[in-house]
Amino acid sequence: MAKKVVAIIKLAIAAGKANPAPPIGPALGQHGVNIMMFCKEYNAKTSDQAGLVVPVEISVYEDRSFTFILKTPPASVLIKKAAGIEKGSGEPNAVQVGQITKAQLQEIAQTKMPDLNANDIEAAMNIVAGTARNMGVAVVD
């Protein structure tokens, strides 16, 4: 018989930097999960993505065991990395803070494809381009 899920916890954690301190500790602790075990497994699985924020969806079962699914990093994080900027524009329509090429846009869309609600790469590129525009990052040829 399948184990009963008692909670689904969604967190966005820096890759390879999970530790029992807030926000991870309290979120998992209230469901009785072994926090150190989660941190070790998460850090091991995300060690190759250093510098990125990797969202994770943790399913906690009634026997206090857990499984987790790693999502793709947020488009905004990937865009900031590609453009080489610290943060997006405060006034995206007035102030441009950086630019990315179509090739970089396609690479980001390819990375985000599993988590986007898009049927093909063109639609995914449009979604990512919209995110870039809202951050004050121009897409150039």
From Swiss-Prot:
SMART domains, A to Z: RL11
Keywords: Methylation, Ribonucleoprotein, Ribosomal protein, RNA-binding, rRNA-binding
UniProt GO MF annotations: large ribosomal subunit rRNA binding; structural constituent of ribosome
Processing after translation: One or more lysine residues are methylated.
Gene Ontology annotations for the cellular component aspect, listed alphabetically: cytosolic large ribosomal subunit
Keyword Plastid tagged: no
An individual GO BP term: translation
Xref: Gene3D superfamilies: Ribosomal protein L11, C-terminal domain, Ribosomal protein L11/L12, N-terminal domain
Subunit field text: Part of the ribosomal stalk of the 50S ribosomal subunit. Interacts with L10 and the large rRNA to form the base of the stalk. L10 forms an elongated spine to which L12 dimers bind in a sequential fashion forming a multimeric L10(L12)X complex.
Physiological role: Forms part of the ribosomal stalk which helps the ribosome interact with GTP-bound translation factors.
Family, per entry: Belongs to the universal ribosomal protein uL11 family.
Annotated protein name in UniProt: Large ribosomal subunit protein uL11
The organism of origin for this protein: Acaryochloris marina (strain MBIC 11017)
Gene: rplK
